[in-house]
Amino acid sequence: DPGYAYLGELLASRGIILASVDENFINGSWSDIFGGLEEENDARGWLLLEHLKVWHQWNKTGGHLLQGKIDTANLALIGHSRGGEAVAHAAMFNKLPFYPDDASVPFDYNFNIKSVVAIAPVDGQYEPGESRAKFEDVSYLVLHGAQDADVSSYMGSQQYERIRFTDSLYHFKAGVYVYGANHGQFNTSWGENDTGNPFTGLLNLKQLLSAEDQQKIGEVYISSFLDITLKNKREYLPLFIDARRGREWLPETIFLSQFEDSSFEPVANYDEDFNLASTTREDGKVTGENLSVWREQEIKLKWEKKGSRALFAGWNYALEAPSDSIGSVPDSLLASYAIRLPAMVVDSSAALVFSMAESTESATPKSEGKWARDKPEKKDANSDTDKEETKKEGEENEDEK
């Protein structure tokens, strides 16, 4: 695909071979007008592995132009959109003995795939065994634009959550959510219109970064990621932890970063069970006081669920006047949420990481709906209280006359 030539030229200048595999023919053709391929991303992933097989053959074929010139011990896969999901399937298929939906189709790849890059990927278009794809011990980078009008939810974050590191080697996964980036401008041919005619007028194109700036972001993150995962140049790791470390290279915009490496030890990720007092670590304990909201639930994206859970905590102080401050609340009524762990020893390179976001829900959810406690009691028409009030109203009316 010539739309990625800019990326190929950059990587080639850094000693990395980039081969673009055109799989657009799988999207459909005129012959599919009454029904074509569906849920075909497994085919895309399989096709990538078959291409790698050919490259391995060329590397070993005497007299071939590429004989001995390919470092087959250091391989990476890059995909965009549906291809962004396909590279995840390829990484999963690479270590399997059979196609997961049909054991009559044997696999025997086992290539040295060190890393995967997903640009604005979809997720769940193909589900092996009716489950979402997941793979282990391969580094992962996902880039997604906040103004993506094609894949409008940050679907690569779902794949991010499912990646695990289990061996003794160093791996990491990173996510970068970019304000002003759309779906198409990572490819020089796709352009600014993510929806296609006649819906272009529905898009606010003024929010977009320029195509040059968006492609620069792709160049910086992808080349740095491959330098780390294929060449072990870990001096670029800080870029994926904090985008401000790349301010000299990156265009001016907002970057939201996620990062987790194989040394990461979760304390409380809220995915382990439904016990609000437990932590991911078996030796931890949670306590909470005076919280009006305390629950754990699935995180919602724009259109889907993220595939992981979070703590939702809220509190509400009924202050009597606008001038009141937190200092007027007795200590016994202060809200708190605490994670208690046994004493542990950590070295100076360790960091405690919190991931937090503001919720738009009410801090007093039990004041309305089925939880309402302060609704006036419904009076019985024959009750003594009702009769007494009626009598008093009648007396007042007589006085007015």
What are these regions (language model features)?
Residues 2-30, 38-46, 172-175, 179:
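Active-site machinery of serine-nucleophile hydrolases
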Residues 14-19, 71-74, 111-115, 136-141, ...:
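Loop/turn elements at helix/coil->beta-strand transitions in domains of secreted/extracellular proteins
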Residues 27-32, 86, 125-129, 150-153, ...:
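Extracytoplasmic/secreted cell-surface and envelope-processing proteins
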Residues 32-81:
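Gly/Ser-rich "nucleophile elbow"/oxyanion-hole loop immediately N-terminal to the catalytic nucleophile
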Residues 84-96:
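Short glycine-enriched nucleophile-adjacent loop
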Residues 133-211:
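Active-site-adjacent alpha-helix of alpha/beta-hydrolase-fold enzymes
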